[in-house]
Amino acid sequence: MKMIRRTLLALLIAPALAHAAAAVDAPAPAFTAATADGRTVSLADFKGRTVVLEWTNHDCPYVRKHYGSGNMQSQQKAATAQGVVWLQVISSAPGQQGYVDGAAAARLNAERGAAPTATLLDPKGDLGRLYGAQTTPHMYVIKPDGTLVYKGGIDSLATADKADIARAEPYVTEALAAVAAGRKVEKASTRPYGCSVKYGG
């Protein structure tokens, strides 16, 4: 009987958590997180600047598509050159695919030529669950007033093939261009694709 009750409770909680995930055109959920280099940062630290959140897992084929081609690094560098804050988030739990400590995260970024503003370590999955991050990559764009204006895939082609990048619609690039121009993001919510975020139990 207890097991049945627990199952029913889980079924009731799951939709509530999904509904509580970050919503487009609403204030982005506030957070504080540890960085790979031992600092602590909060979303509030970047008030007045555009922020990108990128969920990542270096072992995921879909992530390797974008890093192996240089696409993710190019987007990071182009965005940060315009003053955008780019926060890479690792929500893989210890023992799960993609889990790394701070030193390993920094080494991976150096080896791949990645250029995020900071890498946030989220081994308990609190930040990932707060935003409803489902896949790696899963992308979010927050405009300077703190409003979430985009969430979803990095682009329109849900494959692990590097050759598809050139013909895909670059959703994140388009969202950032719209924010910079003071326009509404036309495709504000798209389907994320990639490996599931490897949360702990």
Place the predicted regions along the sequence by residue:
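Hydrophobic h-region of N-terminal signal peptides that target proteins for export
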Residues: 11-20
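A short beta-strand-turn-helix
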Residues: 31-51
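Short, internal strand/loop/helix patches
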Residues: 106-143, 147-149
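Thiol-/selenol-based redox modules, centered on thioredoxin-like
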Residues: 141-201
